[in-house]
Amino acid sequence: MSTSEFVLAQSATVPAPDIEYGQLSPMLIVFGVAVAGVLVEAFLPRRGRYSSHLVLALGGLTAAFVAVVLLAGTRDSVVGGAVAVDGPTLFLQGTILLISIPAILIIAERSVDSGVAAATAEVTAVRGAEPEGGTDAFTPQAFAVPGSVAEREATRNAPGHTEVFPLTLFAVGGMLLFPASNDLLTMFVALEVLSLPLYLLCGLARRRRLLSQEAALKYFLLGAFSSAFFLFGVALLYGYAGTVALPGIADALARGTEDRTLALIGTALLSVGLLFKIGAVPFHSWIPDVYQGAPTPITAFMAAATKVAAVGAMLRIFYVALPDLRADWRPVMWGVAILTMVVGAVMAVTQNDVKRMLAYSSVAHAGFILTGLVAANRAGLSSTMFYLLAYGFSTLGAFAVVTLVRDSRGEATDLSRWAGLGRRSPLVGGVFALFLLAFAGIPLTSGFVSKFAVFQAALEGGAVPLVLVGVVSSAIAAFFYVRVIVLMFFSEPQSDAPTIVVPSMFTAAAIAVGVVVTVVLGILPQGALDLADQAAVFFR
């Protein structure tokens, strides 16, 4: 072999990357269980799929959370620097997994929809059927035309659409990777992995099929559009810095030897993709339609977990890659946060549908969360992570309650139908009132502590006007929350009042978890606040 051939042979050798499987174990477990779920769909008889999926999903999520706990204190970057394992990553991954476990229970519920038939017989409480014998919230055949013979035949032949379990787990895996991504290409892959299953899941509602399919189509088209903005921003930042690694972009900006116009435009486009996922104004138009049309268990999962993942990714980009552009992005985020809080609160007042009201409430909360990001200090980071934890469980519980109020068409989400609900079922009305009070930020609930924490961090960061707007928006939001409580407890029930379904232990457990977390974080929040503060250091 000649010298040139030897050199060529050496240069053609590509070293295998070092993959730290232990530090990636939470994500690997979830993705592994998701793949196993696909195999269950392919090889197990239909009758055994439901229970197998449920055991796999709950076991996998629990194992992944244990892996997160075992990684506590780790500060490192793995897979060639593409993934960061640090305090914010582990805190947010733990939050996503803890939210996903009760979300799976709500998705697995099969007794609630069985109460619809009983609703036409004016039954006020329906005992749940066994999960294997009942029906879930998902259509058994997604491609069938709504109301067609094929759909009715599929409903008779199949009890449910068990593919929702692996789809949900793939979305969870993408959510775990999203806030951990330490370069922009990995972040884009995570964004698509979490988004694609959600596009499908939004269109699988058993009831109100056309509304569900419309929601899925809107979410897909607008989501693809926002992903294009994100990818274009990645290209421009790469053009400026010569790297997609977040620390590398920060180093290029710190040197400051070139015109930053390319970096500023790239940051703006990148922000569009992230603000869309968060549901911030003016990129919020999809939120009310998708939240209303999607199956309510999926709405609950999206509203809680997706926001955690998207905010985590946004925190990493702005705190790790773009600290030297703080003077440029902070004023813009001020404006976005103010618009989001005000528009979300005002629009929620005008809604007559419970799910749309909660959707605009989610928009307003995105503004409160951005207040912590705008603080641009450690207190802002820790308070934002605490807010995501508190908000996630309250949101999950609130949407779980919505699944229990039903009539012959499915969920009775028209607000007028909730009149007297608290009188007919004090427990259901009281639980929903608790979640609404938490959203309003009333003391002794997690919502009060989380809002106080982000406002205090913003004050430390000099964002006094932003805090004033936040307080006013909270007051506006409190009006429509209290309006619903008054409607439930101080109004006469309608003659054709909806059925209040007694769920199986799955939904009951999910609601109970939401109640416990909302109350405990409101009365004894210090442990979670300290944990968030200890985790509030990014690995660079």
UniProtKB/Swiss-Prot annotation:
It catalyses: a quinone + NADH + 5 H(+)(in) = a quinol + NAD(+) + 4 H(+)(out). Belongs to the complex I subunit 2 family. This is NADH-quinone oxidoreductase subunit N. Its main location: membrane. Keywords: Cell membrane, Membrane, NAD, Quinone, Translocase, Transmembrane, Transmembrane helix, Transport. It is a multi-pass membrane protein. InterPro entries: NADH-Q_OxRdtase_suN/2, ND/Mrp_TM. NDH-1 shuttles electrons from NADH, via FMN and iron-sulfur (Fe-S) centers, to quinones in the respiratory chain. The immediate electron acceptor for the enzyme in this species is believed to be a menaquinone. Couples the redox reaction to proton translocation (for every two electrons transferred, four hydrogen ions are translocated across the cytoplasmic membrane), and thus conserves the redox energy in a proton gradient. Its EC number is 7.1.1.-. The keyword Translocase applies. One of its GO terms (cellular component) is plasma membrane.
